[in-house]
Amino acid sequence: VPFYASDIVHTGGNYMTDGLGIAASTDIVYVENSIPDEDVHSIRQEYYGIETYHVVDDPNNTYIDHIDCWGKYLSTKKVLIREVPDSHPQYDEIEETADYFANSLNAWGEPWELYRVWTPGNQPYTNSLILNEKILVPVTGGSWDDEALAVYEEALPGYDVIGFTGSWESTDALHCRVKGIPDLQMLQIFHNPLNNGTEPDTNGYVVEVLFDDLSQTGLIEDSIKVFWKNPDSDNWDSNILYQSISSQEPDLWTGS
């Protein structure tokens, strides 16, 4: 397996990405590196494929300045930012940061869907881990735990949202302490989400899908389909997806 070392220092708790070329950190990433700020961005692009790198001031204004203490990309189109009462000393900074991410664009050029989680006592609810079909959320035994879990359930229906107690702090919780074990042979699938603002063309709704066959065992072409159904229907329909003929996009498949 080829090994590449990039000349950059980075802490895992200060990095989040959508997996489609967009990432975010606080500006402590500049402080931790002795290279020019623009070189930090260049390395993220050249080594990690990050085309849009949001580097922002830390709204919490704590000693650690890690992004997982106040925010999290939940999916390729949803972002979670903590929320505090207007009496909180960092209220203005946190709201400014929430507005910033709500007005930035996802990989499909659409505004991010913003979700908020109530943290009046600096609860570490954003310091969670999404692992396969589960979301592991640090809880404190306080009165806002159930509401925090409900936010995750609303944002990511179908996931098993589980609260975990522990010796959590506002600057040190679950995401800070665990690591995911990657499946190096997995099949990654990315597609453009359809929503109420998506307009159909003459052949219906166009779906674009990127397949990343990490195992390199090959795709079964006649099994690559898009499935859908209407709310009033019990049966699923399907159409074949077709591979792009462009040599620049060999992993792109489209259909409608």
Residue ranges and their predicted role:
Residues 183-256:
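Glycan-association/targeting regions that enable binding to alpha-glucans and other polysaccharides
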Residues 1-188:
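The feature marks the mature, well-folded catalytic cores of soluble enzymes
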